[in-house]
Amino acid sequence: EAEMQWLTALAGVALLRTIKATPAVRLDSELSLKWPNDLLLGGRKLAGILCEHVDLAASGHLVIVGVGLNIGALPEAVKDFAATIECSLDSSSREDFIDAFRGNLVDCISAGDLAAWRESYASLVAVFGRECPVHLPGKAVLSATPLSIDDHAHLVCQSREGEIFTVTTGELSPTPLVEGHLS
């Protein structure tokens, strides 16, 4: 069960490592992770990750890991909050990239325990210690400072009043909001 809670975070770590290790990818800014499921390039969204669990009853279960990665030109309307990578990946190189991502994900999951997962993920999150809007379910927004990740891959924050609380579902906006879009 712990693997399921951490899968999205570990997929982010694996994707970041894969991009950095791919010679055909040219980066012009720093890569970082944004809790719970985004990869940022220079503070703008480069990729999103979604994991879906499928229960197969008696035969077990499987998880589908979906990754949306911006490659090539972006529409003008999204350039303030989205990023893209320049790369030259032909179809066989794309297959190699996907294989490398899968291998990195298996390595991340196999690498150990909760402490190792938390350390790997937290070392790549750029917003710790920086106040930003936290969007909660039901359209509630509060200003808080992300502090850490707990054992369940949830975000631990501190309110302006000093209260420590855990966010299990929500979205951070570490960069300025563009009308109608979370960063």
Which ranges hold each PLM region?
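Short, polar/flexible loop-turn hinges at active-site or ligand-entry regions and domain interfaces
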Residues: 1-2
